[in-house]
């Protein structure tokens, strides 16, 4: 049986972590491209030499020639500069847009049948640019943001309540920025609303809502919190793990319902923009966008978030 080919564009910390996770889970053979001489080759060689210890058997290969991605089933794009302290994701747009144009042209030429997952920031703008340059059907171009943002929200809820993160479900919609929209009423611990458990903990509804508001705010700034602590870069393990969840859903046709940055065509009252929404992911990519009724407050927050996305997208060289 021919193993799937997973192409990684960008050999930084996120790309390296994705390569390691993909190999450990034996999701397919991994090819990594980076423009820096020897970087992708060295990182793939390092991971490959761990195979006898970790007991995985896939091929890993690095290259400085983007034609190496030819025939890829999935392309994961992490190329671009990371955030530094004091920077927002939006501050990255000018330089990362130039990088994305080159990357997208390479994907269009060498992997025209692939499904593409973009992680480069500012995410919503970069996935839009990638789709415009490649011209791929929108269901084959998506961004990773909501999986990570939702995991962060779930983690903060679990830590606050003192429960296992395995039992917490949470969902974040909208753009991958400070205006992202954690959906509080959907946050639960094995079906019990998180707000109810906060009320039980504090014995006061107002206090519970105040604490939840703090968790929402921390979720919105979670990436910045990591950047501030690291000082020299941004998060890489959690974004890579989030990307792997999406890669696995596509490769194994899992039909997973995950929050994905997808192109909307009227859903949630939004058309023509990539926005984080619940999607069914399978072998066809974004196979279905799952729409549900928002409250007035939730819709207002989502509209505001989309407004921020529009500002970014409208500044792109399209």
UniProtKB/Swiss-Prot annotation:
The keyword Nucleotidyltransferase does not apply. Coiled coil: none annotated. One of its GO terms (biological process) is lactate metabolic process. Its EC number is 1.1.1.37. Substrate binds at residues 83, 89, 121, 152. It catalyses: (S)-malate + NAD(+) = oxaloacetate + NADH + H(+). NAD(+) binds at residues 10-15, 34, 96, 119-121. GO terms for molecular function: L-lactate dehydrogenase activity; L-malate dehydrogenase (NAD+) activity. It is an enzyme of class 1 (oxidoreductase). The active site is at 176 (proton acceptor). The keyword NAD applies. Belongs to the LDH/MDH superfamily. MDH type 3 family. Catalyzes the reversible oxidation of malate to oxaloacetate. PANTHER family: L-2-HYDROXYCARBOXYLATE DEHYDROGENASE (NAD(P)(+)), L-LACTATE DEHYDROGENASE. This is Malate dehydrogenase.
